[in-house]
Amino acid sequence: MLHSSALRRLGAKTQVMNPDTDDFVRTRLTHSLEVAQVGREVGRMLGCDPDVVDTACLSHDLGHPPFGHNGERALNKIAAHMGGFEGNAQTLRLLTRLEPKVIAEHDVSAGLNLTRASLDATCKYPWTRTDAPRRADGTQTHKFGIYEDDLPVFEWFREGARDAGVESQRKCLEAQVMDLADDISYSVHDVEDAVFGGHVQLEQLREAKHRQAVFDMTRQWYLPAATAEQLDAALSRLETLNRWVPCMTGSRASLAQFKGLTSKLIGRFAWSLSLIHI
């Protein structure tokens, strides 16, 4: 995985902030390397094979096009007549067909020829567009991880799970670790890039309008049932950390303090995880 051209290609794709010339913000490539480091440690803590988690984390953004979700929507519109486009499904396509490393029988590409466990761990949405689960309002989620004509390889690497009676649309533990490592990494590092790039200062969160905007976005994307009091309490806990940096001045001291903050937050989120058996 580490030597694949698909992974190197992520170096030309932005994460959130546009790269500058004198201080480099994260690209999809550097983000994936950081996700792999977080995922490997979390996976080891939870009893996963760290190499499998590492592979999944390095792979998690391979299929995502330039220009982020806007690029994904544009490609989905263009490909609507042939089943659409989805970055996660494209990741599986790259790993099993498009990345030219192993040619199987009848001159058919086997992609990187990864193990079942590795492919299963990369599968964030283990369903096709047709079989996508429904939300509470009855509408289907637009996310899917399998193109219809990639179903044979999906059924191959999920064969053992199916035989064991595992729910067909449940992600394996390694895939859940990959997903969490991604969330932990971007939730901290994207803010770091925004601060280092001069786009925002953490002290702005003291202002009611900015604080409310963060709460509204959190409810829209992640926690629709959360109250303003709960969100305010969570943010206040972060603001009381001894490494919290209200204002980045650009001095060596503030740079070091902010790096300490990001390390502390990554560790805080990673070590708070635990297994829930259902």
What positions do the PLM features span?
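Glycine/alanine-rich phosphate-binding loops at beta-alpha junctions
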Residues: 1-30
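Sequence-structural signature of the catalytic-core scaffold of metal-dependent phosphohydrolases
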Residues: 2-8, 12, 37, 45, ...
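Catalytic phosphate-handling regions of large nucleic-acid enzymes and associated NTPases
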Residues: 20-31, 62-67, 78
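Alpha-helical phosphate/pyrophosphate-handling elements in metalloenzyme active cores
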Residues: 21-52, 165
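Short alpha-helical catalytic segment bearing the HExxH-like zincin motif
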Residues: 53-58, 179
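Secondary-shell segments that build the walls of catalytic and ion/ligand-binding clefts
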Residues: 252, 256, 260, 273
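Conserved small/polar residues in nucleotide/adenosyl-binding loops
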Residues: 276-278
